[in-house]
Amino acid sequence: MAGHSKWANIQHRKGRQDEKRQRVWTRVMREIMVAARMGGGDLGTNPRLRLAVDKAKAANMPADNVKYGIAKATGSLEGVHYEEVRYEGYGFGGAAIIVDCMTDNRVRTVAEVRHAFSKHGGHMGTEGSVAFQFKHCGQLIFAPGTSEDKVMEVALEAGADDVITHDDGAIEVLTPYTDFEAVKKALEAAGLKPELAEVTMRADNMIELTGEDARKMQKLLDVLEDLDDTQEVFHNAALDASE
């Protein structure tokens, strides 16, 4: 099943994360703390915490930092309490954007998100204005050249919903968010290591943006991602700035 180009967007995202490791660590630490506060500090019974710890390992965060974050969240140490908030809006060409944040000050966060939208050509919407265009699911991305047949066989057997081969050769596995961990483990046990593995909000349909609109949209997304309280930015824009 063919789809739109995927690999360049993944590499852009990974490149920005590599450039800003400390910011990535901060975001992962917030996720660890919220996951541990909501579900407890036991990795064996808290799948959200397990996923957060996996992200910490992928970001090369020291194990002591992870333990410290769990301890703060579960009451062993004093710490800041974060809450999760979601903002929705629009970018260029009517593209939909979701900004998930963790904050200790909602007033500050909403002001920063609204300013980023308005200054860079987008605008904020109301709650629920764009979220219906996305599906909460597990997503695993494999590099071009990975065996499509092997990925498909293992993933579907383990409970994946779909396997998509994109035009650039990247392979995308979609799972129910509740089955993400089981599918990921099955693929890794078969020697198939994804370049990206996460529970995400995946757009049902993409909006193609080219040229100046694509460049402006990328700038808006980058600014939103760089806000201190941002955890994740999801959108439905397929960007091609080459024209």
UniProtKB/Swiss-Prot annotation:
Location within or outside the cell: Cytoplasm
Any idea what this protein is called? Probable transcriptional regulatory protein Bpro_1967
Molecular-function GO terms, alphabetical: DNA binding
Keyword field: Cytoplasm, DNA-binding, Transcription, Transcription regulation
HAMAP family, per database record: Transcrip_reg_TACO1
NCBIfam families with a match to the protein in the record? PRK00110.1, PRK12378.1, YebC/PmpR family DNA-binding transcriptional regulator
Quote the InterPro entries the UniProt record gives. Integrase-like_N, TACO1_YebC-like_2nd/3rd_dom, TACO1_YebC_N, Transcrip_reg_TACO1-like, Transcrip_reg_TACO1-like_dom3, YebC-like
List the record's Gene Ontology CC terms alphabetically.
cytosol
Which Gene3D superfamilies does the UniProt record give?
1.10.10.200, 3.30.70.980
Q: Name one GO biological process term.
A: regulation of DNA-templated transcription
What domain of life? Bacteria
Which family is it part of? Belongs to the TACO1 family.
